[in-house]
């Protein structure tokens, strides 16, 4: 460990904080055979895994913890200090924010699941960091009652997508009339390459709720207005051709190297985004009887976003340059003016999403309980307009393309129940359920003569298809002895992909439609866990689980296009087959927690994006392919302690090491001479991650929080040829510190101020991430 800390200077202060919160004295394990499992606590304080007796390592955040410790503008902010969780939110208001876990990366959105009150927020129409990103915006931070993150595929109630993690967001329902209003402002100071500016954001929300007799309701509205830093940079490969004397001379380009180490010129910034979002949500709950409750949720979200480009290039007169004809002179070398011009574009997005859920569940404490929940998510409107004409004229007019995902959506149905053996000596609690879902992706792109206001023209490309899954599952929690509990379960799933269709337009304008074949698969995933309650404080749990993660519609049928508009769909992808295990030793007291977990995961046919050469295409193309085998193993240390040294000081921390490797990849084709993938690190999984949070509450009014997040660098390619992480499209290691101060003025008013990235770490995770950001918050509770 000393060597590791010496090589990671930023990790030293965080490791010290983590070790401090783990410093509670270790007790010798008692040898009593009469120890029993902990008593059941009040329902409202228990995690989802405790309530359902899932044998899964779980970490949680409550509403009070979020309010005290997190500068939260959107709900995904609440997860930032949980162990081994990274939500790739590039800016406030980002709609492409997938979640990474301890063994899965930020481009693998379908390897984790996000629910809010049983409603699926994960967009399982794809497995990427774009149109596969979760629908976080359907939950407001003020709604949160608690958030639980469950690690690993050890609960039969969840599909194989859970092998990364499951995030369960539980929202509040009022017991009496309540109302609140909050406004949060943020201002980011950003400076990188040729961009130096401030980017503000404002979020305002109003919440109303009440309970009258058997009916309770909650209504909330949220408005977000946000400006982003550059999301992309515009680069061109370094030219080896000397410029002629007649070529116009341009200044402002910045020499750098790309992630493989080749020289490039950075010419500008792209996708500086202004987004305006509104969310409205209604929740109703009605007690049909003392033992039965019906609930309905309706959510609506709309987004209007505009993105533009910035040029660093200037002419000899100082005017900005966006491309043209012929060649130009940059630092003495010749570059194509039209090639430069093709880098600049603008786009606008108009989205409206609807979410509905209907549930019926028992609330009695009898031997049998059950629940039925149906959900539907629909993209009522999802248009993205992009310019293709010359810049900057394209900012106000000109040709372009319109991508329309308006017919995308999904429907889920779950029926589940639990039978609990009652009476003295009861040994079993059996849970069971059935699941069905359908996912639909529609993503046609049309040409248009007016990208801003024009109608759709000729079809340019299309990707569409459907998947359907049916599943049956069961789990038995068996108390073998007073201090020993086994959980045995399994899940059978049947999957089908159908109605796949692709359309592509060649460089000559010829269209190529392809009807893709139907594919299907099925399988059984056993689960086994054993928990030993050694003492009242100490427990040990060993878990094993198999998981099947079936391909999404996007992985099967999504077009892959280069500048030559080439389509490469692969409807014959195989499901990921996961074998995972974890051994967790945990100590819990009234004021502390310590957990050490050893985990290992073997994935066969891992679905990973690779790059290769394809006949007929002059440049390498990225596509999804099954990698034969990957293996991830590691150790995780998590601790929490209240009243450390002084009353009111609480420390939380986590430290994780993961050795993630590709162990077999027969389909690999090297694009760099001498490169290989076997033995290289699994893409997007860092070697080290850590978090540390120190919160001091001297009284009931004030709270002060200082927190830190650390990650080592990671690789994005299967052959690890991206040797330069500190550049656009690279993946750097980082340490960032955050600060928050909150004051409760009285029973109605509270205020908070904070700073994210206090140390102003300038880092890139493919995209440039936010630099130092200031926050201010004011809230009124009725």
Regions found by a protein language model. Give the residues of each.
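Short acidic/polar hinge/loop motifs at secondary-structure boundaries
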Residues: 119-153
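N-terminal periplasmic "start-of-domain" segments of outer-membrane beta-barrel proteins
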Residues: 38-70, 95-98, 126, 184
């Amino acid at each position: 460990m000393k060597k590791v800390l010496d090589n990671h200077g930023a990790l030293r202060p965080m490791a010290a904080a983590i070790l401090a919160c783990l410093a509670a004295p270790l007790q010798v394990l008692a040898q009593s055979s009469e120890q029993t499992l902990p008593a059941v606590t009040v329902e409202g304080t228990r995690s989802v895994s405790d309530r359902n007796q899932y044998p899964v390592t779980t970490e949680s955040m409550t509403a009070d913890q979020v309010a005290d410790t997190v500068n939260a503008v959107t709900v995904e902010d609440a997860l930032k200090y949980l162990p081994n969780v990274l939500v790739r939110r590039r800016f406030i208001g980002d709609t492409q924010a997938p979640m990474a876990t301890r063994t899965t990366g930020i481009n693998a959105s379908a390897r984790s699941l996000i629910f809010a009150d049983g409603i699926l927020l994960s967009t399982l129409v794809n497995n990427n960091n774009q149109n596969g990103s979760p629908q976080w915006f359907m939950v407001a931070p003020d709604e949160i009652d608690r958030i639980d993150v469950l690690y690993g595929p050890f609960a039969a109630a969840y599909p194989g997508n859970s092998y990364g993690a499951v995030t369960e967001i539980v929202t509040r329902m009022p017991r009496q009339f309540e109302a609140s209003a909050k406004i949060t402002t943020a201002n980011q100071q950003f400076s990188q390459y040729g961009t130096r500016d401030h980017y503000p954001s404002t979020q305002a929300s109003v919440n109303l709720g009440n309970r009258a007799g058997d009916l309770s309701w909650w209504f909330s509205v949220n408005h977000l207005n946000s400006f982003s830093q550059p999301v992309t940079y515009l680069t061109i490969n370094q030219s080896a051709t000397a410029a002629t004397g007649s070529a116009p001379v341009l200044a402002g380009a910045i020499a750098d190297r790309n992630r493989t180490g080749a020289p490039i010129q950075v010419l500008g910034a792209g996708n500086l985004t202004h987004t305006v979002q509104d969310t409205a949500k209604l929740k109703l709950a009605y007690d049909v009887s003392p033992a039965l409750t019906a609930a309905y949720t309706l959510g609506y979200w709309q987004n209007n976003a505009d993105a533009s480009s910035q040029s660093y290039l200037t002419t000899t007169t100082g005017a900005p340059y966006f491309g043209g004809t012929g060649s130009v002179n940059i630092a003495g070398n010749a570059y194509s003016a039209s090639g430069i011009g093709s880098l600049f574009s603008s786009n606008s997005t108009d989205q409206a999403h609807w979410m509905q859920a209907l549930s019926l569940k028992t609330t009695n404490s009898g031997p049998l309980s059950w629940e039925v929940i149906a959900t539907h998510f629909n993209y009522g409107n999802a248009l993205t307009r992009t310019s293709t004409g010359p810049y900057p004229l394209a900012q106000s007019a000109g040709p372009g393309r319109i991508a329309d995902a308006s017919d995308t959506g999904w429907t889920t149905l779950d029926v589940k129940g639990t039978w609990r053996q009652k009476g003295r000596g009861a040994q079993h609690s059996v849970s069971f359920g059935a699941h069905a879902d359908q996912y639909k992706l529609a993503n046609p792109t049309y040409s248009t003569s007016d990208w801003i206001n024009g109608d759709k023209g000729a079809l340019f490309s299309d990707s569409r298809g459907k998947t359907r899954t049916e599943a049956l599952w069961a789990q038995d929690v068996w108390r073998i002895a007073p201090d020993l509990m086994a959980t045995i379960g399994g899940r059978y799933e049947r999957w089908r992909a159908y109605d796949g269709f692709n359309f592509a337009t060649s460089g000559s304008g010829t269209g190529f439609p392809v009807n893709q074949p139907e594919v299907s698969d099925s399988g059984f995933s056993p689960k086994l866990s054993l928990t030993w309650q050694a003492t009242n404080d100490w427990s040990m749990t060993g878990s094993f689980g198999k998981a099947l993660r079936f391909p999404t519609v996007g992985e099967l049928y999504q077009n892959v296009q280069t500048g030559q508009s080439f389509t490469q769909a692969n409807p014959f992808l195989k499901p990921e087959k996961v074998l995972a295990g974890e051994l967790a030793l945990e100590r819990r007291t009234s004021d502390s927690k310590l957990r050490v977990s050893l985990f290992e995961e073997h994935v066969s046919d891992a679905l990973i994006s690779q790059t290769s050469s394809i006949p007929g295409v002059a440049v390498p193309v990225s596509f999804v392919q099954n990698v034969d085998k990957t293996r991830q193993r590691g150790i995780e240390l998590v601790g929490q302690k209240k009243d450390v040294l002084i009353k009111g000081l609480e420390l939380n921390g986590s430290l994780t090491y993961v050795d993630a490797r590709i162990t077999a990849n027969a389909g690999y084709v090297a694009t760099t001479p001498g490169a290989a993938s076997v033995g290289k690190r699994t893409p997007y999984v860092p070697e080290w991650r850590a978090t540390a949070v120190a919160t001091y509450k001297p009284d009931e009014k004030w709270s002060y929080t200082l927190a830190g997040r650390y990650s080592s660098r990671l690789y994005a390619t299967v052959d690890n040829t991206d040797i330069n992480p500190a550049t656009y499209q690279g993946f750097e290691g980082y340490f960032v510190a955050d600060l928050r101060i909150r004051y409760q003025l009285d029973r109605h008013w509270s205020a908070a101020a904070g700073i994210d990235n206090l140390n102003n770490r300038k880092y890139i995770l493919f995209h440039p991430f936010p630099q130092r950001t200031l926050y201010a918050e004011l809230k009124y509770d009725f």
